[in-house]
């Protein structure tokens, strides 16, 4: 049963991949937006992304985008400094 849950979460994390050219254009603008819907719709700046399932040290995107060592992520759920099911931009 746990394997099915893990497989479902991994599938959701990979559902909306972003191409390399989109990633560069987003980074050059300094800010980004996430696709609408239920999955990966919350923009966050996170320092660590573990296999697209869990992102650590996350915070909301500031007016200048992500600064320092944090990278832009689109997360399904973000709470208490962590993001769940995140795609790194």
Swiss-Prot record:
> What Gene3D superfamilies does its record include?
Hydrophobin
SUPFAM superfamilies tied to this protein: Hydrophobin II, HfbII
Question: What upregulates or represses it?
Answer: Expression is slightly induced in the presence of root and stem powder of Shanxin poplar, as well as during carbon or nitrogen starvation.
- A matching Pfam family: Hydrophobin_2
Q: Per its UniProt record, what InterPro entries does this chain match?
A: Cerato-ulmin_hydrophobin (IPR010636), Hydrophobin_sf (IPR036686)
> Disulphide bridges in this chain?
34-74, 45-66, 46-58, 75-86
Keywords attached to this Swiss-Prot or TrEMBL record, sorted alphabetically, are: Cell wall, Disulfide bond, Secreted, Signal
Residue span of the signal peptide, if any? 1-15
The superkingdom listed in its UniProt entry is Eukaryota
Q: Which CDD domains match?
A: hydrophobin_II
Q: Which GO terms describe its cellular component?
A: extracellular region
Give the location in the cell: Secreted; Secreted, Cell wall
* Keyword Disulfide bond on entry: yes
- What assembly does the database describe for this protein? Homodimer. Homodimers further self-assemble to form highly ordered films at water-air interfaces through intermolecular interactions.
Family listed: Belongs to the cerato-ulmin hydrophobin family.
Q: What this chain does, per the record?
A: Aerial growth, conidiation, and dispersal of filamentous fungi in the environment rely upon a capability of their secreting small amphipathic proteins called hydrophobins (HPBs) with low sequence identity. Class I can self-assemble into an outermost layer of rodlet bundles on aerial cell surfaces, conferring cellular hydrophobicity that supports fungal growth, development and dispersal; whereas Class II form highly ordered films at water-air interfaces through intermolecular interactions but contribute nothing to the rodlet structure.
Please give the name of this protein. Class II hydrophobin 2
Give the originating organism. Trichoderma asperellum (strain ATCC 204424 / CBS 433.97 / NBRC 101777)
Tell me the gene name. Answer: HFB2-2
């Amino acid at each position: 049963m746990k394997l099915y849950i893990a497989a479902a979460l991994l599938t959701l994390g990979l559902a909306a991949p972003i191409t390399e050219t989109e990633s560069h254009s987003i980074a050059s603008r300094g800010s980004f937006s996430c696709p609408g819907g239920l999955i990966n719709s919350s923009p966050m700046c996170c320092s660590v992304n573990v296999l697209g399932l869990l992102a650590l040290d996350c915070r909301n995107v500031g007016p200048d985008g992500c600064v320092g060592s944090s990278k832009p992520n689109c997360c399904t759920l973000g709470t208490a400094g962590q993001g769940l099911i995140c795609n790194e931009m």
